[in-house]
Amino acid sequence: GIKDYLKKLLQKAINKIKSLRKKQDA
């Protein structure tokens, strides 16, 4: 449903932020 879709979008956004932070730290 919509809730599952929103959860997937949130996870994608979180993963992007985490990867960006890792690149900055490196």
Curated annotation (Swiss-Prot):
Superkingdom, taxonomy of origin: Eukaryota
Gene Ontology terms: biological process: killing of cells of another organism
A GO term from the CC aspect: extracellular region
Tissue-specificity statement: Expressed by the venom gland.
Protein's recorded name: Oxyopinin-3a
Subcellular location(s) of the protein: Secreted
Chief location bin: secreted
Molecular function per GO: toxin activity
Keyword line: Antimicrobial, Cytolysis, Secreted, Toxin
Organism: Oxyopes takobius
Role, per record: May have cytolytic and antimicrobial activity.
